[in-house]
Structure formats: structure tokens, C-alpha cells
Swiss-Prot record:
Keywords: Ribonucleoprotein, Ribosomal protein
Entry keyword annotation includes Disulfide bond: no
Keyword GTP-binding: no
Cellular-component GO terms for this entry: cytosol; ribonucleoprotein complex; ribosome
Domain of life: Archaea
Protein name: Small ribosomal subunit protein eS17
Species for this entry: Aeropyrum pernix (strain ATCC 700893 / DSM 11879 / JCM 9820 / NBRC 100138 / K1)
The organism's taxonomic lineage, starting at the top: Archaea, Thermoproteota, Thermoprotei, Desulfurococcales, Desulfurococcaceae
Length: 74
């Protein structure tokens, strides 16, 4: 089974991605630094969870885009 993320992590990650889509990549370390600059959380664990979920969303979007391009070629 996968890990369950709390609603705060998902909501914050989606808002950040919606507001700053060009700042985030598929690299967790990069996203971690960007998240720490954009939001002021005291918890390192929460920052890492948000950055990890953003990384997951970015990677899933890129996989979805590649699959759509491949199906369009066929």
C-alpha cells in the first residue's frame, strides 16, 4: 500500500503548483528548496512532504503528456 498524505499537504502542493507552475521540476531536492523559499513552515517534515508530493505530481503530469504524445502518433 502507498503512503497516505494529509489534506494540508495535498492542498498546499496543488496551490503552489497552480500559482508557480514554472518553478517546480521532477527533482525533489530542487523542489524542497523552492518550497522552503515560498512558504514559512517550522516543520521540516511538512516541507519535505509538500515537496515530495509536488515532485510526484510533476512526474505524473510529464508521464501523462508523453503517453498522450505517443498515442497521438499512432
Amino acid at each position: 500500500m502507498g503512503k497516505v498524505r494529509i489534506r494540508l499537504v495535498k492542498r498546499t502542493a496543488r496551490k503552489l503548483l497552480e500559482k508557480y507552475p514554472d518553478l517546480f521540476t521532477g527533482d525533489f531536492e530542487h523542489n524542497k528548496r523552492v518550497v522552503s523559499q515560498l512558504i514559512e513552515y517550522r516543520s521540516k517534515k511538512l516541507r519535505n512532504q509538500i515537496a515530495g508530493y509536488i515532485t510526484h505530481l510533476v512526474n505524473m503530469a510529464s508521464k501523462r503528456k508523453k503517453a498522450e504524445e505517443a498515442s497521438a502518433r499512432i
